[in-house]
From Swiss-Prot:
It comes from the Bacteria. The keyword Zinc applies. Signal peptide: none annotated. Residues 1-21 are annotated as: Disordered. The gene is nrdR. A zinc finger (unnamed) spans 3-34. Residues 49-139 form the ATP-cone domain. This is Transcriptional repressor NrdR. Keywords: ATP-binding, DNA-binding, Metal-binding, Nucleotide-binding, Repressor, Transcription, Transcription regulation, Zinc, Zinc-finger. The keyword Repeat does not apply. One of its GO terms (molecular function) is DNA binding. Negatively regulates transcription of bacterial ribonucleotide reductase nrd genes and operons by binding to NrdR-boxes. It comes from Anoxybacillus flavithermus (strain DSM 21510 / WK1). Binds 1 zinc ion.
Amino acid sequence: MKCPSCHHNGTRVLDSRPADEGRSIRRRRECERCHFRFTTFERVEETPLIVVKKEGTREEFSREKILRGLIKACEKRPVALEQLEEVTQQIERELRNSGINEVKSETIGEMVMEQLSKIDEVAYVRFASVYRQFKDLNVFIEELKELIKKEQGERA
């Protein structure tokens, strides 16, 4: 591996350890010429996951987009950023483990709503109102009734 400081090809590994819950390996390296120390990460190259949008366009999956949507929905709510990152990671892991290379944006939206309903009901309603594009108050009220019915069913 080339040294990022002097661009010499000779480096040696000083330390290796698992990182990112075992999905990558962190290596501490040192250049044989200038003795500059740096860290590299080795991970399996994943096949791209493609999201098929409602209008039929395709784009590469972006975990950042999911996280931004979660953060927006949970704005001024008592939800930790770590919890939202965990949800994002869980959704991505579930999609990648499914073995499919293309996923509909609707599927991702439903997964996000399912997770939000477990975390914070207000955030769930916020996300659902944007995601489902409620046209009027009656549709919004119906969604709230479904949420209440679901919550009462879980308590029973």
